[in-house]
Every structure is written in structure tokens, then in C-alpha cells.
């Protein structure tokens, strides 16, 4: 089998290019150079970092891209006007089959627009989608789909999201029979607006065809409870849940720290106990840490395109690279196309 080539956007993210280069170097060294990295970005900013990390012995090439799509750029406009950007050029390499996957912690909207514009859709896919991880009670994670790529969804779109994410979970996440729940205002059949009733019927039909394991409606409190592996909703609802979830650790932390300090000052708690409590608090919220998985793929585009959080660290970049490798090896896109054809 030929060595895989993964393109990494050196200019993507708030901490680029330093954290991107560091994460790329870590991935290659940790993996024993089992794949090739094509790092793409502005030469004057990236090459000094490559020298700093003594990357000569690594399976890494560099390609200059003079333009950068920033977090402030309007996605659709930037993708069209900045054709020489690292983001667009990296995806074009994948389209031309000169690389197997593209990884970036850059502008999410631009990544979605460019992935669709450059790579196109897999056969049978009506709309590509993006999902998010949520912690859950017990083992595993809950995946919510869609979380912002599609805010105006038809029932058939929601069903395809469930089907594509089912394939991803089976082969990329090694979940044998992931359960699918439809987010609604009640768990009984017949609840919710008309488009959700129609979606329920289509999901049930997909389950009868053995495409998914549909368990019915789920409610908001079921997300963290882990009732379903996959929770399906439109992008407006999903993005709202995602942003709310991201705010939880910061909000509780802002309450916890002063309360802890007050207890120490009052003598109700000594410093060592406070330190242990702080460690416990940090451990509780580890499942909310986006660094663990690094990023998420756009499901339904004709190529592997993985986007990370704008604040991605070197650890997140490294894990995105591993995710790309695993998706390629498990032929996730081929399996999605086969299901939908």
C-alpha cells in the first residue's frame, strides 16, 4: 500500500503556524513516519519553524501558499477571492488526487464552503454535514448532527445525516450498532412540528432497511445521559446546543474558583484540600476538551476534509492528523457512497 499523504494547513487557527508545525512534527515522530505530511502555508512564517524543530528527518514536504483566509473573512467571498490561500490550495491537491486528506484549524465556514466548492459531494449526497462530540454518562460519546452546516433542513436531509454518521461511527469510531435518536419536544411518536413527524417516518423506514438503528425521539436531557449515540437535529438547533455546551466549563469554573478561595480564606478548607478539589473539577470537565479528538470531518464531501477548533493546540492538530489517517484506512467515504447509491 502506498504511503498516505495528508495536507496540513499551516496557517489555520488562532495559534498558527507555531502550534500547527509543532503538532505536525509530533504526529510524524510519534507515528514513526508512517505517513507523509505536506505542510502548506506562507514560506517566510513556516520555514523558520521547520528549522527550529529539525524536521529534515521527517516525511514532510512544504508548499508555499501566499494567501491566508482569516477567521474574520466572509467564507464565501474569501474562498472565491483567495484562490492562492493555503486552505483552497490544500483542498485542490486532494481534488487532483495528489493528496489523500486535508486538515485545518482555520475558518470553519470557509472550510465548509471550500470543501463543497472544490471537492464536491459524494454520489447520492444531498447536503454534506458536520457533527459535534458531547460527553455522556458512562462510556463513549454522543454525536449531534447537524451543528451549523445546514440550518434549513428537509426531512430527507436529516435522514442522510443519520446514515452518514452511522457509517462514520461504525468504521472510524468502532461502534458496532450506533443508536440514532431524533431530537424533539417529547419522546412519543407524533410529537413535534410536521417536518419532524415526517423525519421520524423516514428514519423508521431507514431502520427497517437496516441502514441505521433508530430508537425514536429523544429530548434535550437525553444528550448527556447517553440515550443515543447519534442525535439528529437541524443546524440551528445543533449549533445552539454546541455553543451552550462549550460555555458550561467556563461558566461553572467562574463560580467554582471564587467559592473555593472563599472557603480557604474562611478556614473551612485548607490549601491541600482546595488543590485536590481543583484537580477533581478539572478531571470532571476533561470530556468537554476539544483537544482529545482534535476536529471533525465534513461528512458527504468527495474527499477527507477535517476542521478543528480555531483555538487548536499542537495536540489537537496531531489528533486531527491521526483522524484523517484512520478515515482513509477505513474507507469511510467509499462506504457512505455505497450506502447512498
From Swiss-Prot:
Highest taxon in the source lineage: Bacteria
GO cellular component: cytoplasm
Annotated Pfam families: FA_synthesis (PF02504)
UniProt keyword Protein biosynthesis present: no
E.C. numbers: 2.3.1.274
InterPro entries membership: FA_synthesis, Phospholipid_synth_PlsX-like
Location of this chain's protein in the cell: Cytoplasm
MF annotations from Gene Ontology: phosphate:acyl-[acyl carrier protein] acyltransferase activity
Signal sequence bounds: none
Pathway entry: Lipid metabolism; phospholipid metabolism
Catalytic activities: a fatty acyl-[ACP] + phosphate = an acyl phosphate + holo-[ACP]
GO biological process, one term: fatty acid biosynthetic process
Enzyme kind, highest EC tier: transferase
Predominant cellular place of this UniProt entry's protein: cytoplasm
Function: Catalyzes the reversible formation of acyl-phosphate (acyl-PO(4)) from acyl-[acyl-carrier-protein] (acyl-ACP). This enzyme utilizes acyl-ACP as fatty acyl donor, but not acyl-CoA.
Subunit structure: Homodimer. Probably interacts with PlsY.
Identification of the protein by name: Phosphate acyltransferase
Primary gene name: plsX
Amino acid at each position: 500500500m502506498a504511503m498516505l499523504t495528508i495536507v496540513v494547513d499551516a496557517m489555520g487557527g488562532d495559534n498558527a503556524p507555531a502550534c500547527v508545525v509543532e503538532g505536525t512534527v509530533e504526529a510524524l515522530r510519534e507515528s514513526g513516519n508512517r505517513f507523509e505530511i505536506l505542510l502548506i502555508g506562507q514560506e517566510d512564517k513556516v520555514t523558520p519553524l521547520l528549522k527550529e524543530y529539525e524536521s529534515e528527518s521527517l516525511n514532510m514536504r512544504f508548499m508555499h501558499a501566499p494567501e491566508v483566509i482569516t477567521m474574520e473573512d466572509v467564507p464565501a467571498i474569501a474562498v472565491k477571492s483567495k484562490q492562492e490561500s493555503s486552505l483552497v490550495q490544500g483542498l485542490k491537491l486532494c481534488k487532483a488526487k495528489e493528496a489523500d486528506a486535508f486538515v485545518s484549524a482555520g475558518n470553519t465556514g470557509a472550510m465548509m464552503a471550500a470543501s463543497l466548492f472544490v471537492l464536491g459531494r459524494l454520489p447520492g449526497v444531498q447536503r454534506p454535514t458536520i457533527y459535534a462530540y458531547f460527553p455522556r454518562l458512562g462510556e463513549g460519546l454522543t454525536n449531534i448532527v447537524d451543528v451549523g452546516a445546514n440550518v434549513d433542513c428537509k426531512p430527507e436531509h436529516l435522514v442522510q445525516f443519520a446514515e452518514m454518521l452511522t457509517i462514520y461511527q461504525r468504521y472510524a469510531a468502532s461502534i458496532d450498532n450506533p443508536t440514532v435518536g431524533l431530537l424533539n419536544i417529547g419522546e412519543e411518536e407524533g410529537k413535534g412540528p410536521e417536518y419532524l413527524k415526517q423525519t421520524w417516518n423516514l428514519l423508521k423506514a431507514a431502520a427497517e432497511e437496516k441502514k441505521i438503528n433508530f430508537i425514536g425521539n429523544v429530548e434535550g436531557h437525553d444528550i448527556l445521559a447517553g440515550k443515543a449515540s447519534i442525535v439528529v437535529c437541524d443546524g440551528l438547533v445543533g449549533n445552539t446546543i454546541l455553543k451552550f455546551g462549550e460555555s458550561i466549563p467556563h461558566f461553572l469554573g467562574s463560580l467554582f474558583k471564587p467559592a473555593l478561595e472563599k472557603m480557604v480564606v474562611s478556614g473551612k478548607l485548607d490549601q491541600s484540600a482546595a488543590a485536590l478539589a481543583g484537580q477533581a473539577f478539572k478531571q470532571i470537565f476533561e470530556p468537554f476538551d476539544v483537544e482529545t479528538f482534535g476536529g471533525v470531518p465534513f461528512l458527504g464531501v468527495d474527499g477527507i476534509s477535517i476542521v478543528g477548533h480555531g483555538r487548536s493546540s499542537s495536540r489537537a492538530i496531531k489528533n486531527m492528523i491521526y483522524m484523517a489517517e484512520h478515515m482513509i484506512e477505513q474507507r469511510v467515504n467509499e462506504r457512505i457512497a455505497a450506502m447512498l447509491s
